[in-house]
Amino acid sequence: MKNKIYLIVSILFLSVTAISAQTDEEKQKLSIFSEYVKAKNYNAAYAPWMELRLASPRINKAIYVYGERILNDTIANSEGEEKIKYILDLLKLWEERRTVFPNITPQGAYLAKASQLKYDNQKLLGESKEDLYTAFDAAYITDAKTFTNPKSLYTYFSLMVGLYDSSLKSAQELFSKYDDISEKIDFEVKNYTNKRNAFLGEDGEVLELSRKDTSRLKSYNSYLRAYNQIAGSIDTKLGSR
């Protein structure tokens, strides 16, 4: 009986030791690739990042935040089949993020990012205009609230115009989508204007802000400039149709 108890205790001790050692190793890999990413040494970051991504996908959101930066850099410095491989892996990474961290991965935002990535590489990936529009449309229908990227909203409407010009969409569908996107832009302009104004005084002067709030204000102003630009671009794109 004593021997059995000793054996059980020994097994438990070895298991805990192994888990602890594994956790320490994972933390070390996380620290290593994180520091490489911060230094923008993406080539060095790739191997430890990929090892940890495959072994422990739930350990930390940095796998997905920094992983996106790593793959974007790899895509930018690749060509042909190799570039396609990394593009597809980035799309896969976003899917994994939605599975592992759904609460911090808004569907509309990430489906739009995936659609934009496909659009930006449509020739390389062999994507048709119809398939691209369907992808953007699915993102918008699924979660319009977080589909806020100005560039993607413009791309979405631009694809609709292209399909209309190819007689694949009706005039009613075109103008309905124009109204839809225009209303979305108006809503987001009001949204970001309110966010920006929270950092301004009564006379419009910028209040004394923390570094974090200064960064937020810069982001809000950037969004407002982008929305103003695409609002005009959408009108131009529609033209006399």
PLM feature segments, named:
Residues 1-26, 68:
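Bacterial Sec-dependent N-terminal signal peptides
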Residues 22-241:
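Preference for long, solvent-exposed alpha-helical segments and helix-linker "stalks"
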